[in-house]
Amino acid sequence: MTGARVTASGWGWRHAGRARPAVSGLDLDIRPGERVLVLGPSGAGKSTLMHALAGVLGDDEDGDETGELLVDGRRPSASRGRVGLVLQDPDSQVVLARVGDDVAFGCENLAVPRAEIWPRVGQALADVGLDLPLRHPTSALSGGQKQRLALAGVLAMRPGLVLLDEPTANLDPEGVVEVRDAVLRSVEASGATLIVIEHRVAVWQHVVDRIIVLDPAGGVLADGPTDTVLSTEGERLAAAGVWIPRFPPSPPERRDRSEVPAAEVLLRAEGLVVGRVPFARKRAVAVAGDLDLTLESGTATALTGPNGTGKSTLALTLAGLLAPAGGHLAAADALAAGLGPAPHRWRSRDLLERVGTVFQDPEHQFLAGTVRGELAIGPRALGLGGAAQAERVDALLHRLRLDHLADANPFTLSGGEKRRLSVATVLATRPRLLVLDEPTFGQDSRTWSELVRLLAELLDTGTAVVAVTHDDHFVDALADARFVMAPAAGPASAGAISTGTIVPASVATPTTAAETGAP
């Protein structure tokens, strides 16, 4: 198999109902077999380009196209069998109930002989480090495991063009290296062309041939060999919001502890067991237990650890959206404010002003047809009047750089914009406790800094923050402590579950090649 060639001539796309194009004036020529890292500030159109190359962007009703974009000299819609795409949101690519069937699905659509499919499936799962039975339910996978599953499905198809949109965003550091190396082995063996969108430049900089930086104003900011772009354009790109290894983000300024309100206990877990109810089951299956954790006002706790250890399940339980599977979880009076101690028994309106939750997938919490409408839902539910409601919404639109998208459909935003909107919807109700799942996913360095600065200000006024994260910059900037989840000491079939331990925030996770930028 040979790699696919990608060409663009004055190409652009404007989503229906949007005044500004997502991409405009794009000229590209990517040769067969090239490995390209695509960078750019949040909202520069990176994901739009990937969807277009995969032939899934939509038709005339979904937007207006200008110029020409070709894969092997044909429109992308005519080249779908040659292209494999891993999306930002892994949930959107899980189509079948069992792991093996899901990976085999693409091969079946390409009419790969049956005798060849299952060896491909097994190899792809091994390559991405998803060591699970073929019959394992996809509904029981964590976000990071679903990301590996989506990649395995693409690698099993052996396409001529591999498109990866933030493929390591939800992975732990070891998983980042494992997945990157699996991709490299696959494209080396097949000769496929590789195009990657990734904010972690250090992960890919030594293994790609070329970097292309998209300009939000249209066209390309920089294009050339990796070392050349990073050395000659690094400072300019960092100023534009592109993550450059030599220019780490600056931590926010924090108020002196003597000026911050005294800490109050908000929520306490003792011997807590957390779990979920799998599809077609009636009882929760425990995924982590023996968890002791105290959350206090004005403090930030980072939930860290490998994929699949139950971090998101713990976060949802602390937020009152899942009932504990065992142990003890109680809200103190400072949070309950007259309600009972069990958050999962509170009404949704009661949760609104006490606990705000940002899901791992932003789209799971969008309800309105516009960004402005989305931000107004919480304040309206709290009974805020028109003027006060509009003032609060406008302030958040401005603070999180969403002003120009106020009338846009939330589902047409970029991944980074969706994440900022999901955080803003929670901030709109001003809860005492924020529970955030991967809050910095998809952010460029400027929007990352603004988001972290906003959370720091909330901490200084007494809001408590709990965040599931693999972002060590975020931990260093905000966290007072880490709650580190550890994998089960035995197989799940034998009843083994994950555990967790609280440690100082300064205790770092083991350094990996992903963090140092080594290949």
Language model segments and positions:
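The feature captures the beta-strand-to-loop junction immediately N-terminal to the Walker
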Residues: 39-41, 304-306
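Catalytic Walker B motif of ABC-type/P-loop ATPase nucleotide-binding domains
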Residues: 162-166, 434-438
